[in-house]
Amino acid sequence: MATLDDLKKRIASVKSTQKITKAMKMVAAAKLRKAQESAEKGRPYSEKMNNIILNLSSGISDKENAPKLLSGTGEEKIHLCIVLTSDRGLCGGFNSNIIKKAKVYFKKIAEEEKTLKIITVGSKGHDQLKRVYKDNIVERISFKDSKTINYLDAEKVGKLIIENFEKKEFDVCTIFYNKFKNVITQIPQEQQIIPLKTPEVEENSSGDNYEFEPDEDEILSNLLPKNISTQIFKAMLENSASEQGSRMSAMDSATRNAGEMVDKLTIEYNRSRQAAITKELIEIISGAESL
């Protein structure tokens, strides 16, 4: 049975931890507001960019000579996967959920006997994936020193991907990230960015028609690289908001659990103290009676 001193030390230790988790929750809440706002503002832009490219692609006259970023290499033998995770922990199941999503895709690639290459963005994802997929990881990227998510970081990743694609290092590129829904819910996403998936358009469909100057091919050649960076930036913004939301939720839960533990330990301490006092009184009374 724990002594009174042991219980006092445990109560003090849990209270100290509770202060830390409460502070982390408040910091995450402050960061979440900004991250959520950035993610919500970025969604319309990335969606519009994607829609413009899809509209342009439907007007290409020579499909065989379409930009490779749109049409692909004609094969799907080598798959490059970009897995976005966090550089810091204490954010609940945020990292494990997206890793789980990515591993399902990796298993599918292995079953189809295709080649898998991985780029990890975030040290936590790298640490988990290297245990099983060490030989598949071709690049490790971290923005730990960046205070905020910015487009230049996404553009660096985008340029790296395009360079590898032009060197014929892969055929298909898919990005994995968490989409922010609310503080409690973050949804793991899987999005193919190379080649860009274009929906089948019916001949008699009455969609919006635009005239482009210069022609669609030239505009696409300029827009496609920007779109890749834009989609990566969107994923990074969503991931950042999801991370802060998950951390806030995890720290809130940890703070409440610490409070409950303090209450239980305090009750145990009071009972032990009461028992010790009662025992001491009995010994005093017994000693007095024996005199």
Q: How would you name each of these model-derived features?
A:
Residues 1-291:
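C-terminal beta-strand-loop-alpha-helix "lid" module of Rossmann-like NAD(P)-dependent dehydrogenases
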